[in-house]
């Protein structure tokens, strides 16, 4: 279950990292030089998530990982729905930072590896989850070019948004499986 969640996270993370700079040049008409600051805000937000998400899950949600995945899924979906309608650089830049933070759910997923594998097997679990992230990254590279050429820019963001809704559903399923096991 968490491998599917990880794969979706890889599609979202690398889909945004790959296609946002191209979106700025093609859809917003910015040169690479003009759009570079905006494009950098996405990975800066993702880096922040790696520290913020585990902290929030531990301090606010008392070690429960699922509420953070749920919050991240909903905010990422809403951001993906809104992003294609933003037509100027400053709001797009702010949105990219926010999306970078919330789309980067692997900060929570790596913590789940410790929950699932314990001290003995957490590295093995991380390896499996990281493999799934990489497979998601590879899938987006193959599929999103076709999606963009066939359906246009909004379809890429809508696809990522819909995938985060699937991530949300998978999180609820994983939560139910976890409570049944206990």
Features from the language model and the residues they span:
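Interfacial helix-cap and linker-helix signal at transmembrane-aqueous boundaries
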Residues: 24-25, 56-57, 144-152
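Helix-to-loop junctions at the C-terminal end of transmembrane segments
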Residues: 50-63, 148
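C-terminal transmembrane helical hairpin of 12-TM major facilitator-type secondary transporters
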Residues: 63-109
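Intracellular helix-loop hinge segments at the cytoplasmic ends of transmembrane helices
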Residues: 22, 108-116
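Extracytoplasmic gate region of multi-pass secondary transporters
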Residues: 1-51, 140
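A late C-terminal transmembrane helix in Major Facilitator Superfamily
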Residues: 114-151
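Hydrophobic transmembrane alpha-helices of secondary-active solute transporters
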Residues: 5-14, 42, 46, 83, ...
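Multi-pass alpha-helical transporter architecture, strongest
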Residues: 83-84, 153, 160-182
């Amino acid at each position: 279950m968490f491998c599917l969640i990880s794969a979706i996270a890889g599609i979202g993370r690398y889909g945004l990292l790959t296609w946002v700079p191209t979106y700025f040049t093609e859809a917003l008409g910015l040169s690479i030089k003009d759009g570079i600051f905006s494009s950098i805000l996405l990975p800066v937000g993702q880096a922040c998530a790696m520290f913020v998400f585990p902290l929030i899950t531990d301090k606010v949600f008392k070690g429960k990982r699922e509420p953070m995945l749920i919050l991240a899924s909903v905010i990422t979906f809403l951001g993906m729905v809104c992003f294609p309608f933003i037509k100027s650089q400053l709001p797009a830049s702010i949105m990219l930072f926010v999306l970078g933070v919330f789309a980067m759910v692997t900060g929570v997923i790596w913590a789940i590896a410790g929950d699932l594998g314990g001290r003995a097997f957490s590295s093995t679990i991380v390896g499996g989850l990281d493999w799934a992230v990489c497979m998601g990254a590879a899938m987006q590279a193959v599929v999103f070019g076709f999606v963009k050429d066939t359906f246009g820019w909004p379809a890429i963001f809508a696809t990522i948004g819909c995938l985060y809704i699937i991530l949300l559903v998978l999180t609820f399923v994983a939560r139910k499986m976890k409570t049944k096991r206990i």
